[in-house]
C-alpha cells in the first residue's frame, strides 16, 4: 500500500527521510550491532545521540546558554502540573484561556494555588485570540501561561502578550519548531513532541536557569522537579531513548531544510493554499478569525454534519486521512505540520474543490 497524506493532529506525519533513515538503522545503528532501542542509556553511543540532539535543537532555536534543554517523559499533561509545582512561589498563576489545553493547564494549576483566568476567548468557542496588550496581571503572579498555538480550534497568538514583567510560560506543542521564537522572551517553553517533532511519549522543556531551583512546592515528587532533569542532563532515570533518537533526526532534517525561518516560509505557503480556498468556497468554511489563524491546524466545516461525514469518508478513500475534527467540536481539521509536503496540501485542496463541485 502506498503512503497516505496524514492530517492527524498528533501523533502526526513524520518526515519520510527520517523514517527511512531510522528503518535503515533499526537493526544496526552505525556499526554498533544493535538497535538504538536496545542501547543502554549510559552507553557512549546513546550519550552522543543525546548531546547531538540537544546541540542541534539549540542551533535551530538559537537557545541562549542560560537556558537548559530538558527531555522529559510524560507529555503535555505532566507539564500542566510541573509548571505550577516548580514556579508557584507565591502560589499564584495567571492564565490566558484560548482553548481546551490552556483550560486544562489552568484547572491543574488550581490544585496547587490560585490560578486566575486573565483573558479568555471561550465566549466565541475559542475562535479568536483575546486582546493581550493590557492584561489584568496579578501583582503577585509567579508567571503568565499561554498555549501559543491551539490544536483543536486552530488559533495562534499573532504576537506575544504583555505580561508586565512577569515570567511567560508557553505550551508550544503544536507549533514547536514551525517558525523562529525569541527564546529570551520566555521563562519556559515546553512542547509535547508527538505533533511536530517526534513520536509520542516525551516533552521537551526549555527552562531559564534561574527558574530551576530547589524552591518548589512542598511534596513535589523528584521526577516532577525541573532540577532533577537539569542536574542530570536528562539522565536521572532511563529516558525515552528511541524518542530522543528520532527527535534528533528531525532536528537534523530541519537544519537541512534551511532552519526555522525557511520552515516558516514553507508553512505559510501551505496554510495560504488551504485558507485561500476556504475563503472562496461556497461549501467549506473556516471557523477562525482571519488574523488569528494557525499555520499548523486548520479547522473547517460545511454546516451539515451529514456532509461533513460524507467528506471525511470520501477523503479517506482518496488517501487523505485523519481529517475528522476533535471529538469535542466536530467538523474537519487539517493539521499541516512541518513534515506535511506542500504537494499534500495542494492535492487536498484539489480534492475539496472537486468534492464541492459534485455536491453543490
Predicted regions and their residues:
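PLP-dependent enzyme catalytic core of the Aspartate aminotransferase-like
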Residues: 2-4, 317, 326, 330-360
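A glycine-/small-polar-enriched, mobile loop at the entrance of the PLP active site in fold-type I
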Residues: 3-54
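Active-site C-terminal subdomain of aminotransferase-like
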Residues: 15, 193-275, 289, 358-360
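Conserved N-terminal alpha-helix of the aminotransferase class I/II PLP-enzyme fold
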Residues: 32-79, 86, 100, 108
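Conserved PLP-anchoring active-site segment centered on the Schiff-base-forming lysine
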Residues: 88-103
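Active-site phosphate-binding strand-loop segment of PLP-dependent enzymes
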Residues: 109, 121-176
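Conserved active-site segment immediately N-terminal to the catalytic lysine
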Residues: 169, 183-194, 203
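Conserved PLP-binding catalytic core of the aspartate aminotransferase-like
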Residues: 284-315
Amino acid at each position: 500500500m502506498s503512503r497516505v497524506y496524514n492530517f492527524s493532529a498528533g501523533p502526526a506525519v513524520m518526515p519520510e527521510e527520517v523514517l527511512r533513515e531510522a528503518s535503515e538503522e533499526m537493526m544496526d545503528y552505525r556499526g554498533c550491532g544493535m538497535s538504538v532501542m536496545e542501547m543502554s542509556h549510559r552507553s557512549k553511543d546513546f550519550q552522543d545521540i543525546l548531546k547531538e540532539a540537544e546541540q542541534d535543537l539549540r542551533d535551530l532555536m538559537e537557545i541562549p546558554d542560560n537556558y537548559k534543554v530538558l527531555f522529559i517523559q510524560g507529555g503535555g499533561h505532566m507539564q500542566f502540573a510541573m509548571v505550577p509545582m516548580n514556579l508557584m512561589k507565591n502560589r499564584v498563576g495567571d492564565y490566558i484561556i484560548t482553548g481546551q489545553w490552556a483550560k486544562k493547564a489552568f484547572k491543574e494549576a488550581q490544585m496547587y494555588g490560585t490560578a486566575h483566568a486573565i483573558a479568555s476567548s471561550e465566549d466565541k468557542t475559542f475562535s479568536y485570540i483575546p486582546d493581550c496588550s493590557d492584561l489584568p496581571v496579578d501583582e503577585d503572579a509567579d508567571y503568565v501561561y499561554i498555549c501559543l498555538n491551539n490544536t483543536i480550534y486552530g488559533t495562534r497568538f499573532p504576537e506575544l502578550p504583555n505580561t508586565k514583567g512577569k515570567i511567560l510560560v508557553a505550551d508550544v506543542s503544536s507549533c514547536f519548531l514551525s517558525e523562529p521564537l525569541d527564546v529570551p522572551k520566555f521563562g519556559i517553553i515546553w512542547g509535547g513532541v508527538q505533533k511536530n517533532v517526534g513520536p509520542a511519549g516525551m516533552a521537551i522543556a526549555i527552562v531559564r536557569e534561574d527558574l530551576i531551583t530547589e524552591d518548589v512546592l512542598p511534596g513535589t515528587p523528584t521526577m516532577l522537579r525541573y532540577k532533577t532533569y537539569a542536574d542530570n542532563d536528562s539522565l536521572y532515570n532511563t529516558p525515552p531513548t528511541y524518542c530522543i533518537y528520532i527527535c534528533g533526526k528531525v532536528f537534523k532534517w530541519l537544519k537541512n531544510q534551511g532552519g526555522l525561518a525557511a520552515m516558516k516560509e514553507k508553512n505559510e505557503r501551505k496554510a495560504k493554499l488551504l485558507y485561500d480556498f476556504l475563503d472562496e468556497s461556497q461549501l467549506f468554511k473556516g471557523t477562525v478569525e482571519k488574523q488569528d489563524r494557525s499555520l499548523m491546524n486548520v479547522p473547517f466545516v460545511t454546516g451539515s454534519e451529514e456532509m461533513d461525514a460524507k467528506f471525511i469518508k470520501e477523503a479517506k478513500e482518496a488517501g487523505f486521512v485523519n481529517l475528522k475534527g476533535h471529538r469535542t467540536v466536530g467538523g474537519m481539521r487539517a493539521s499541516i505540520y512541518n513534515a506535511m509536503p506542500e504537494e499534500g496540501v495542494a492535492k487536498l485542496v484539489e480534492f475539496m474543490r472537486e468534492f464541492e463541485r459534485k455536491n453543490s
